[in-house]
Amino acid sequence: MEKVLVIVGPTAVGKTALSIALAKKFNGEIISGDSMQVYRSLDIGTAKVTETEKEGIPHYLIDCREVSETYSAADFQKEGRQKIKEITEKGKLPIIVGGTGLYIQSLLYDFQLGSREIDDSPEIRETYNLFAEEKGNQALWLLLQQKDPLAANSIHFNNRKKVIRALEVFDKTGYSILTPKEKPARLYDYYLLGLETDRALLYERINQRVDQMMTEGLLEEAKQMFQQPHAQAAQGIGYKEFFPYFSGEQSLEMAVETVKQQSRRYAKRQLTWFRNRMAAHWWNLVQQPTDLPKLEKEVAEWLQQKESE
């Protein structure tokens, strides 16, 4: 079973810097586990690692899709597993870094995405089809997001067939279409590091990051996505919040505040996901940076162990 180091946590908590430090120390290469960093030209709003920050460490699953293309958890699962294999075969340590919980969970476990088998229900499908015809695909997808956010986050809102199937499964079973019937098997000997910090401090860091993004040109990236509003990438935080401003319906100041608010809410959801669904070793390096040697020691001990039982 291949060893994989995984670094998770909310936005603006220092995952990138830690991943570079550990890659240098343990001969690692990095796989991005972020659903938005796959898109070319969306660098600022996705907080993509810069060439300078990489310090020569190879990074994968970044800049591998055009903004007009879709990208799903199933895509990440397939491509991520291939990269783990390639990195391991080079004698290096695969390091997964990111904040998209479903992506990382589907990669580490034998998670059969979208495979829950139930009988078709034409009546339910017809009801939702009529709803979509009247209200639109976006409204249908938002309905799924309310009922089953796990599935909604893995399906593009314009894929009406998949959205309806997910709603159908949830209505008939009470479970997400992504919920396996049995506990999925673990595919890797992984060590999961979680980064967190005081909530007030985290929110302050998020606000500062958004201000810095604005200085670096976030508005231009958002304008690019405003011209492609139906693209999956346009739904990312930091882009769609500016659409009312571009339409003349809202001030720039209010749009920026909305980005900050949505980013804070997303960070809260990220923390909830990882705490509830994945058993991580949690560290607060923002407030306790001197804990880094202790963290590195634990990783070194894990690497020396034989395959985990």
Swiss-Prot record:
**Enzymatic reactions:** adenosine(37) in tRNA + dimethylallyl diphosphate = N(6)-dimethylallyladenosine(37) in tRNA + diphosphate
Q: Which residues bind ATP?
A: 9-16
Known InterPro entries for this protein?
A: Dimethylallyltransferase (IPR039657), IPT (IPR018022), P-loop_NTPase (IPR027417)
Segments for region (Interaction with substrate tRNA): 34-37
Site positions per UniProt: Interaction with substrate tRNA: 100, 125
Superkingdom to which the source organism belongs: Bacteria
Q: What is its EC number?
A: 2.5.1.75
Which pairs of Cys residues are joined through disulfide bonds in the record? none
Residues engaged in binding substrate: 11-16
Gene Ontology terms describing biological process: tRNA modification
Q: List keywords of the entry alphabetically.
A: ATP-binding, Magnesium, Nucleotide-binding, Transferase, tRNA processing
How this chain assembles, per its entry, is: Monomer.
NCBIfam families, from UniProt?
miaA
Give the family this protein belongs to, as stated in its UniProt record. Answer: Belongs to the IPP transferase family.
- Role, per record: Catalyzes the transfer of a dimethylallyl group onto the adenine at position 37 in tRNAs that read codons beginning with uridine, leading to the formation of N6-(dimethylallyl)adenosine (i(6)A).
Give the protein name, as stated in the record: tRNA dimethylallyltransferase
Source organism: Enterococcus faecalis (strain ATCC 700802 / V583)
At the highest ranks, the source species' classification is: Bacteria, Bacillati, Bacillota, Bacilli, Lactobacillales
